[in-house]
Amino acid sequence: YLAAKSSLTQAQFHRQGVGAGSTLVAALQHGTVVCGMTTQPTVSALETQKIAYSAIDLATTDGADKWLGGAFPSAAVLANADWVNANKDTVQKVVDALVATMHYIATHSAADIADHLPPNFVSNGLVTKDLYVKALDQDKGQFLPDGMMPANGPDTVLAVEKLAGKVTAPVDLTKTYTNDFVVAANKLEGFAQ
């Protein structure tokens, strides 16, 4: 999408999967790739080690608005509609846990969150705990406190997919997602008015 938006053709670049974390760091250090797309804490590790810098921010609301035209929901509970309809109790339990997690993230500091994660996740060969906390604090805004689909999210995703050539037929966005389970989870958890 970003290439198409900048009028680059697929003949002008190629994609290569190198993973995230230490494998992306190594790929950049050894010239296997010259540009990468990743998330925190890899971004902070790359910047701190002066291996790379953030050219495009897609992790914040402002960055998504600037580069994608609006909110771009990327973390979700994804399942086939037939399975969802046949397993509503299970789906509700998963969404309840996700909403409780989003609320926890919104109401706790990055340091509090890091204290409850596995030690080797927040402090390892790639990042220190302090760097992890700093990165999480910087990017906490990408986690929506109520877990609801952002109002313009589906439209943004569709526009991106169309420009990237992934969607060529009409799409009824109302059939692609539901907030029903999220609304119920917020009520159950006591987060809804």
Spans of model-derived segments:
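Pocket-lining segment of extracytoplasmic ligand-binding domains
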Residues: T23-F121
